[in-house]
């Protein structure tokens, strides 16, 4: 058995030498090295400067060609210096516009508010309404509400009352005034007691009544 050992050792040494890392250099795998360098670098696009233009989607346009870039609805022209795009002065959108479309180069109002809002309710253009007994309102064409508040006349009595659905106070018993603590009707003389006769001032209901007190004896007027 002894004479065969040296031959086995020689075979093992030969195999180790064949797979030694030190024996493999970069020049042995040029294709793999190039692939690795390409993977580590960013993808390089063709340079179209002075030759054409590229939009956001990667489409190439020739010099002088008109196109619409992805980020804008305004047309552009491809030049040697790059895209030159139209930038028109767009008209202002109406402040009452409720629907705006951006399909064209300029935004366009497609629907204008055609009603008025007042105290949580909506009204048609030119519609008249009364939000309260004392107000008369109308929805104007400019979508604004114009109201007029009733200008009530001064009541000619000291005890006016407010009726439901009526704006201004009324004197249910007609004009009157105070004679002391007593309310007397206007226009006539009123005997407030056995010795006193009172009369309201004509048209001046807020003034105390004019009273004439006669001479009395034991609470009875003397003639």
Curated annotation (Swiss-Prot):
Function per UniProt: May play a role in bone differentiation and matrix mineralization. May play a role in neural development.
Record-given protein name: von Willebrand factor C domain-containing protein 2-like
Entry-linked PANTHER family: BRORIN FAMILY MEMBER, VON WILLEBRAND FACTOR C DOMAIN-CONTAINING PROTEIN 2-LIKE
Ranges of residues in domain VWFC: 51-110, 114-172
Pfam families for this protein: VWC2L_1st, VWC2L_2nd, VWC2L_C
Signal peptide range: 1-21
Cystines in this chain: none
Entry keyword set: Developmental protein, Repeat, Secreted, Signal, Synapse
Gene3D superfamilies, alphabetized: 6.20.200.20
Source organism phylogeny: Eukaryota, Metazoa, Chordata, Craniata, Vertebrata
Principal cellular location given in the protein's record: secreted
Species whose genome carries this gene: Danio rerio
GO cellular component: AMPA glutamate receptor complex; extracellular space; synapse
Subcellular location: Secreted; Synapse
GO biological process, any: negative regulation of BMP signaling pathway
């Amino acid at each position: 058995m002894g004479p065969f050992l040296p031959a086995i050792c020689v075979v093992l040494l030969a195999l180790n030498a064949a797979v030694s890392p030190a024996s493999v250099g970069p020049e042995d795998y040029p294709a793999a090295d190039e692939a690795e360098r390409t993977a580590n670098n960013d993808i390089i696009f063709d340079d179209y400067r002075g030759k054409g233009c590229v939009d956001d989607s990667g489409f190439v346009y020739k010099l002088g060609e008109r196109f619409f870039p992805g980020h804008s609805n305004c047309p552009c022209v491809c030049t040697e210096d790059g895209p030159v795009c139209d930038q028109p002065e767009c008209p202002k959108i109406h402040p009452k516009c409720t629907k705006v479309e951006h399909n064209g180069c300029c935004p366009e109002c497609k629907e204008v508010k055609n009603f008025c809002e007042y105290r949580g309710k909506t009204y048609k253009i030119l519609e008249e309404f009364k939000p309260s007994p004392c107000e008369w309102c109308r929805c104007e064409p400019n979508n604004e509400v114009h109201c007029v508040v009733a200008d009530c006349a001064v009541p000619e009595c000291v005890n006016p009352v407010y009726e439901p659905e009526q704006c201004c106070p009324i004197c249910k018993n007609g004009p009157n005034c105070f004679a002391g603590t007593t309310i007397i009707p206007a226009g006539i003389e009123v005997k407030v007691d056995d010795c006193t006769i009172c009369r309201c001032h004509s048209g001046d209901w807020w003034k105390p009544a004019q009273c004439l007190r006669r001479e009395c004896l034991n609470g009875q007027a003397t003639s």
